[in-house]
From Swiss-Prot:
Homology family: Belongs to the insect chemoreceptor superfamily. Heteromeric odorant receptor channel (TC 1.A.69) family. Or1a subfamily.
GO biological process: detection of chemical stimulus involved in sensory perception of smell; sensory perception of smell; signal transduction
Further details from the record: The atypical heteromeric and topological design of the odorant receptors appears to be an insect-specific solution for odor recognition, making the OR/Orco complex an attractive target for the development of highly selective insect repellents to disrupt olfactory-mediated host-seeking behaviors of insect disease vectors. Odor-evoked OR currents are independent of known G-protein-coupled second messenger pathways.
Tissues and organs where the protein is expressed, per its UniProt entry: Not expressed in either the antenna or maxillary palp.
Compartments where located: Cell membrane
Record's protein name: Odorant receptor 22c
Residues annotated as transmembrane: 43-63, 74-94, 135-155, 174-194, 202-222, 277-297, 308-328
Pfam families linked: 7tm_6
Extracellular side: 64-73, 156-173, 223-276, 329-402
Membrane topology (UniProt): Multi-pass membrane protein
Keyword match rRNA processing: no
Cytoplasmic compartment segments: 1-42, 95-134, 195-201, 298-307
Primary subcellular site in the record, as a coarse category: membrane
Gene this chain is encoded by: Or22c
Lineage, broadest ranks: Eukaryota, Metazoa, Ecdysozoa, Arthropoda, Hexapoda
Length: 402
C-alpha cells in the first residue's frame, strides 16, 4: 500500500528490477542526507562482480583452449559471453551510480507530477507490463541457471545408481586452478560457480529490466503530454465558435507553455538515458547474433537430452533479453511521434497566428521521433527481425562446414 500522499504508480515503480538491483548491490540509491551508497551495497557488488568476472574469464578461456571440439567450445562460449557482457553492464552501473540515481529521481518527478486518476491508471498499466516482462526475464534466467546447475548432479546421480564410472562435473565448462577441483574443495567450487550463474542472472535482470521499465515509463510520460494537449482544447468548449477569442488563445498559450516544459523535460531525460545506456545496448546487440547462433548450434549438435533442455532454457532467456531492448525502444519512438499526431488532430486552425507558432514549435519537435539510438542501429522490432535473420544466416553458413 502506498501512503496517501503517493500516486498509484509508486507501488509499481521499478518493482522487479529494484529487487535484482538490491541483490547485486547496484540499485541506484543514496544514504539519506545526501551521502554515498550504503556500505552493504558495496560488499554485495564486490561479491557479485567477482563471481561474474571469474565465470566470464574462465569460461571464455575454456572455449578458446578447446576450439578443436566445437560442441565443448560452444558450451563454454555461450554462458561465458553472457557473463562477459554482464561484467560490462555491472561496471557501467557501478561507475555512474550517482548519475543513475539522479535519473531515477528525475523520472519519478515526471511521473509523480500528474495525480489524475486517468493518468495514474494509464501509468500503472504500463508499469505492470514492464514488471511482468522483467519478471519473465528473471524467471527464464533463473530456470537457465538451475538447468546448468542441476544437469551435472542429475547425471552424476544416474551414474551412481547404475554404477557407471565417472565423477560429477562442474555446472559450467571453465578453467580453474587445480586446487579448486580437489575432492575436499569441489563442493565449495560447485556452490561458487552456481553463485556466479545466479549473480549473472540478477545482473542482467536488473540492467535489462531497468531499461524496459524506463522505456515504458517514458512512453507513459509522452502519453501524459498527449492527454494534456487533448484537455487544453476540450476545456475550451470551442465547438460553438469558428475562431477562438483572445482570452481563449491566451489560455491555450499559457497551458501549452506548461506542456512544452514537460515535453522538453521528457526529451532531455530520454537523451540522458540513451547516453548512459549506449555502451550497454551496443555491446548487447553486437553479441546477440553470436549468442543466438552458438546456442542454436549447441542444441543441434548436442546428443544429450539434458544439455538440449538446458540450452532451450538458455535461448529463451537470450531471446527475452533481446526482445525487451527492441520492445522498449520501439515504444519510446512510437509514443514520442504520437504527440505530433495528437496535436495535429486538435482545433489548432481556430487559434490566432501567435498561438499557431507555439503549436508549430511543438509539432516540429514531436515529428522527430525520440529514439534510444546507439551507433549503427536503433533498438526496435525491425532491428529484432534483422538480428534473428542474421543469426539464421550464420547458422546456415556454419552448417556447411560441419
Amino acid at each position: 500500500m502506498t501512503d496517501s500522499g503517493q500516486p498509484a504508480i509508486a507501488d509499481h515503480f521499478y518493482r522487479i528490477p529494484r529487487i535484482s538491483g538490491l541483490i547485486v548491490g547496484l540499485w541506484p540509491q543514496r544514504i539519506r542526507g545526501g551521502g554515498g551508497r550504503p556500505w552493504h551495497a558495496h560488499l554485495l557488488f564486490v561479491f557479485a562482480f567477482a563471481m561474474v568476472v571469474v565465470g566470464a574469464v574462465g569460461e571464455v578461456s575454456y572455449g578458446c583452449v578447446h576450439l578443436d571440439n566445437l560442441v565443448v567450445a560452444l558450451e563454454a562460449f555461450c554462458p561465458g559471453t553472457t557473463k562477459a557482457v554482464c561484467v560490462l553492464k555491472l561496471w557501467v552501473f557501478f561507475r555512474s551510480n550517482r548519475r543513475w540515481a539522479e535519473l531515477v529521481q528525475r523520472l519519478r518527478a515526471i511521473l509523480w507530477e500528474s495525480r489524475r486518476q486517468e493518468a495514474q491508471r494509464m501509468l500503472v498499466g504500463l508499469a505492470t507490463t514492464a514488471n511482468r516482462l522483467s519478471l519473465l526475464l528473471l524467471s527464464s534466467g533463473t530456470a537457465t541457471n538451475a538447468a546448468f546447475t542441476l544437469q551435472p548432479l542429475i547425471m552424476g546421480l544416474y551414474r551412481w545408481i547404475v554404477q557407471l564410472p565417472g565423477q560429477t562435473e562442474l555446472p559450467f565448462n571453465i578453467i580453474l586452478p587445480s586446487f579448486a577441483v580437489q575432492p575436499g574443495v569441489f563442493p565449495l567450487t560447485y556452490v561458487l560457480l552456481t553463485a556466479s550463474g545466479a549473480c549473472t542472472v540478477f545482473a542482467f535482470s536488473f540492467v535489462d529490466g531497468f531499461f524496459i521499465c524506463s522505456c515504458l515509463y517514458i512512453c507513459g510520460a509522452f502519453r501524459l503530454v498527449q492527454q494534456d494537449i487533448r484537455r487544453i482544447f476540450a476545456d475550451l468548449h470551442g465547438d460553438s465558435v469558428d475562431v477562438f477569442t483572445e482570452e481563449m488563445n491566451a489560455e491555450v498559450r499559457h497551458r501549452l507553455a506548461q506542456v512544452v516544459e514537460r515535453h522538453n523535460a521528457i526529451i532531455d531525460f530520454c537523451t540522458d538515458l540513451t547516453r548512459q545506456f549506449t555502451v550497454i545496448v551496443l555491446m548487447h546487440f553486437l553479441s546477440a547474433a553470436f549468442v543466438l547462433c552458438s546456442t542454436i548450434l549447441d542444441i543441434m549438435l548436442n546428443t544429450s537430452s539434458l544439455s538440449g533442455l538446458t540450452y532451450i532454457c538458455y535461448i529463451i532467456a537470450a531471446l527475452t533479453q533481446l526482445f525487451l531492448y527492441c520492445f522498449g525502444g520501439n515504444h519510446v519512438s512510437e509514443s514520442s511521434a504520437a504527440v505530433a499526431d495528437v496535436l495535429y488532430d486538435m482545433e489548432w486552425y481556430k487559434c490566432d497566428a501567435r498561438t499557431r507558432k507555439v503549436i508549430l514549435m511543438i509539432l516540429r519537435r514531436s515529428q522527430r521521433a525520440k529514439t534510444i539510438a546507439v551507433p549503427f542501429f536503433t533498438p526496435s522490432l525491425p532491428a529484432l527481425r534483422s538480428i534473428l535473420s542474421t543469426a539464421g544466416s550464420y547458422i546456415t553458413l556454419l552448417k556447411t562446414f560441419l
